Amino acid sequence: MREIIHVSAGQCGNQIGAAFWETISGEHGINPSAIYEGTDPLQLERLSVYYNEAGNGKYVPRAVLVDLEPGVMDAVRSGTYGNLFRPDNFIFGQSGAGNNWAKGHYTEGAELVDSVLDIVRREAENSDSLQGFQISHSLGGGTGSGMGTLLISKIREEYPDRMMATFSVVPSPKVSDTIVEPYNATLSVHQLIENADETFCIDNEALYDICQHTLKLKQPTHADLNQLVSGVMSGITTCLRFPGQLNSDLRKLAVNLVPFPRLHFFMVGYAPLSAPGQQSFRSLTVPELTQQLFDSKNMMAASDPKRGRYLTVAAFFRGKVSIKEVEDQMRSVQERNSAYFVEWIPNNVQTAICSVPPKDVKMSATFIANSTSIQELFKRVGDQFSAMFRRKAFLHWYTNEGMDITEFAEAESNMNDLVSEYQQYQNATVDDEDMEYEDELPLEDEM
């Protein structure tokens, strides 16, 4: 089976990772003791993508949990689903990274990285045909960003032909823990551009807005934000976990969504969004779901897709839905909004359907878009970065760990280049003479 190994790094990464495992265990009928008690054979058919069947009939997540301090690990371990995980797969330091990317990447994290790679290696050896890795982490702190990107580059070095997907939480001043978040995020994006194949950008600002405006939560907690994220992660991975034709593995997903290797940062959306305990008594129709999906209020990135253009889109519908109705709806959205889709990638919207709905709703839909408007998110972080970097504020925390200032300048310029590339493709038309880019190989050379 095409296995995926999940790595959670840092506080945020472990919190959304734990919420993800709890959600998908529920969908696959795995109880907190790791025993299958489901009723639908579809739950078992591709279970081995994410779970390893242990000798005692238990299904153990292919998960590695990493942090530079023990607090969150203890919380995960003592949580409802804490016994699901293999105890050896919790790896933690004691000192923490103090929200400092350099500590995670070069000092504290570097000391722990070999023991993490040993566990990753063991999980890879337990796989018949490993398709790749998925990392959950945040870009604003020290461990998830610094050590998370260190792990990504080390895993990439050792498994260069496997897919690398990341669920990356982008910081926002609205939900800020620390003043140096723009530094940590920019240094991380610099790494993700080079070492990840697909990055699902989860933007704290957008999560916060959804909680306040759509879910009507006055003071959203981290648990509320994590609940949203786990729903989206469950939706994105539906095609990987249940039988289906389209985007059934990480590589096929990337082939459909990534037109140029550096442009692999996706906006994600989810519908229906309803407050806990407010599940509506009326099921949404396919047209309503589709409309919600394309609404910027349902996007987990605080960028408005109407300010850019879609390069590619994948939508996943779950539940008892008619394939024809879904395809008609998606086509009609495209026809009504053709200005927002680049015309030089024909058939750039793809739809998949899975008959297993998520728990508690009859139908749901998840949306993954490679939209040029994601540049707004990078610009937001970049502006905050340059405001501090121009004054060399807080840099001593990084240089004291042995970092060189040139690395900051390189990261800033790589992220600025990414923004310009998105802009360039946003403006491109079918007839552009300069659409032949020297650095893109012809397809047959790449395969």
UniProtKB/Swiss-Prot annotation:
Subcellular location: Cytoplasm, Cytoskeleton
Keyword Cytoplasm set for record: yes
Protein name, UniProt field: Tubulin beta-1 chain
Family per similarity comment: Belongs to the tubulin family.
Keywords: Cytoplasm, Cytoskeleton, GTP-binding, Magnesium, Metal-binding, Microtubule, Nucleotide-binding
Function (record text): Tubulin is the major constituent of microtubules, a cylinder consisting of laterally associated linear protofilaments composed of alpha- and beta-tubulin heterodimers. Microtubules grow by the addition of GTP-tubulin dimers to the microtubule end, where a stabilizing cap forms. Below the cap, tubulin dimers are in GDP-bound state, owing to GTPase activity of alpha-tubulin.
One annotated GO molecular function: GTP binding
GO BP: any one term: microtubule-based process
CDD domains attached to this UniProt entry: beta_tubulin (cd02187)
Annotated positions binding Mg(2+): E69
Cofactor(s) of this protein: Mg(2+)
Subunit relationships: Dimer of alpha and beta chains. A typical microtubule is a hollow water-filled tube with an outer diameter of 25 nm and an inner diameter of 15 nM. Alpha-beta heterodimers associate head-to-tail to form protofilaments running lengthwise along the microtubule wall with the beta-tubulin subunit facing the microtubule plus end conferring a structural polarity. Microtubules usually have 13 protofilaments but different protofilament numbers can be found in some organisms and specialized cells.
Cited PROSITE patterns: TUBULIN (PS00227), TUBULIN_B_AUTOREG (PS00228)
Matching Pfam families: Tubulin, Tubulin_C
Organism domain of life: Eukaryota
Cellular component per GO, a single term: cytoplasm
Lineage: Eukaryota, Fungi, Dikarya, Ascomycota, Saccharomycotina
Binding annotation for GTP: Q11, E69, S138, G142, T143, G144, N204, N226
